[in-house]
Design a protein with these regions (language model features):
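A residue-level marker of the well-folded mature domains of exported/periplasmic proteins
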Residues: 1-180
Length: 180
């Protein structure tokens, strides 16, 4: 049968990772796949290590969280695809890698982070009394490619509405805890 290595992104038992894990288990059961779940504690370096270990085991497929970004994952995915391993990304897109390997099964399951951030800001403006000249605090991950597009959109939409935004970048220590 088919073997899939699947990085849930988080830690065993965390809220988001459990949802992703349960979906992967259900899909594997539906397709008759052997599933190897990996937990990276939201650490991009650990995600890369897990990917290298997965490639060494030569599964049929690997599902990654794109948090490390195209620069880090791209060459590794290139090598895996050359070995015949199908790779795909969830949660955080790898647009350059996907463009290169779409024809060999590389896809993306998740949201468009900019659209998501824009929708959130529009809803905040609709539900609150924020108006031109008011201040809002936003924290996000603008430093991280793709994931940062959500915070970027929130800031842009609020500023377009005349709201002064006080922005704080989320530290890596806080980012690894999905509860926060």
């Amino acid at each position: 049968g088919m073997t899939i290595w699947f990085d849930t992104g988080g830690s065993v038992g965390d809220g988001y990772g459990t949802i992703v894990q349960n979906g992967a288990k259900a899909a594997a059961a539906d397709m008759g796949c052997e599933l190897r779940l990996l937990y990276s504690d939201w650490n991009p370096e650990t995600m890369i290590t897990h990917f290298r270990n997965a490639v060494a085991a030569r599964p049929d497929g690997i599902v990654v969280m794109g948090h490390p970004g195209d620069a880090a994952f791209g060459p590794l995915v290139d090598a895996a695809v050359k070995q015949g391993i199908v790779v795909t990304s969830i949660d955080t897109a790898l647009p350059e890698t996907q463009a290169r390997h779409r024809a060999k099964g590389f896809g993306y399951v998740g949201t468009d982070n900019y659209t998501q951030g824009k929708a959130l800001a529009e809803e905040v403006l609709r539900r609150t009394n924020l108006k031109k000249g008011d201040r809002a605090f936003v924290w996000g991950l603008k430093r991280i490619p793709d994931r940062g597009r959500r915070a970027q959109a929130i800031v842009e939409m609020l500023e377009q509405a005349g709201v002064t935004v006080d922005y704080q970048e989320i530290t890596p220590e806080i980012d690894k805890d999905p509860v926060l």
